[in-house]
Every structure is written in structure tokens, then in C-alpha cells.
């Protein structure tokens, strides 16, 4: 997962199921869009607002016409459904992504280095 650069995006990801989609990076999947079209390709990136960048895409419009695209950017507002590939362990993927976020948040571990959210001093 290419980590979000802002604290806000990491917080949104951590507190929603978007973290599951971020864990699908590199997987080939199908994204159903609100206009009844379908895009199938490899997930390159998913941000905290569910914007999805796909590569090697087969785009099928609502009338069944197919177009091959090198890449496609889908805004989160236009996503209806993302198909989770059968081989993905959902629980393990979420836990792995949470560990990545927590590792970045703590900047090197407990008691080492600067913290993203400094602890309150009594």
C-alpha cells in the first residue's frame, strides 16, 4: 500500500473499510460504477476517499461496448461496488493494513523517535 501522506487520510482509512480496498493493491478485480458500466483491471492505488486508479483496464459501458485502456481513474463518488477477489483473506488484509498505518504513526516503535500524535503530558 502506498500510504496516504496526510494524517486525515490515514485516519479516514483506519476507521473505515476503505483500508480493505487499499490492501487489494496489485490485485486484479472488477469495479462496478454508478452509471452501470464496469471496469476490470489491476488496482494501482486507492486513497482515503475511495478514488481508485486501475491499470490494464477492460472498460465495459452500459451497452456492452468494451474498450481496452492502459489506466483509468475512478472517483469514489462513481463507485457502486468493488468485487473482492476470491483468494483474498479479508481479515488478514485489514490487519496487515492496520499494522502498516500504526507503524507509520509511531515512527519507529514505542519510545523511539517522534510521534505523529504526541502524548499528553500530565
From Swiss-Prot:
UniProt entry tagged with the keyword Secreted: no
Cellular compartments per GO CC: Cajal body; U7 snRNP
Alphabetized Pfam families for the sequence: LSM (PF01423)
One GO term (biological process): positive regulation of G1/S transition of mitotic cell cycle
PROSITE patterns xrefs: SM
Domain Sm: 16-88
GO MF annotation, one: snRNA binding
Subunit-level organization: Component of the heptameric ring U7 snRNP complex, or U7 Sm protein core complex, at least composed of LSM10, LSM11, SNRPB, SNRPD3, SNRPE, SNRPF, SNRPG and U7 snRNA. Formation of the U7 snRNP is an ATP-dependent process mediated by a specialized SMN complex containing at least the Sm protein core complex and additionally, the U7-specific LSM10 and LSM11 proteins. Interacts with CLNS1A and SMN.
Name of the molecule in the record: U7 snRNA-associated Sm-like protein LSm10
Phylogenetic placement of the source organism: Eukaryota, Metazoa, Chordata, Craniata, Vertebrata
Underlying gene: Lsm10
Amino acid at each position: 500500500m502506498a500510504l496516504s501522506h496526510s494524517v486525515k487520510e490515514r485516519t479516514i482509512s483506519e476507521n473505515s473499510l476503505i483500508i480493505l480496498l487499499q490492501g487489494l493493491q496489485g490485485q486484479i478485480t472488477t469495479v462496478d460504477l454508478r452509471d452501470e458500466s464496469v471496469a476490470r483491471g489491476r488496482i494501482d492505488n486507492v486513497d482515503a476517499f475511495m478514488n481508485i486508479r486501475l491499470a490494464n483496464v477492460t472498460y465495459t459501458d452500459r451497452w456492452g461496448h468494451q474498450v481496452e485502456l492502459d489506466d483509468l481513474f475512478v472517483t469514489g463518488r462513481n463507485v457502486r461496488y468493488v468485487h473482492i477477489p476470491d483468494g483474498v483473506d479479508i481479515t488478514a488484509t485489514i490487519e496487515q493494513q492496520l499494522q502498516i498505518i500504526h507503524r507509520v504513526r509511531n515512527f519507529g516503535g514505542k519510545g523511539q523517535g517522534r510521534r505523529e500524535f504526541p502524548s499528553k503530558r500530565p
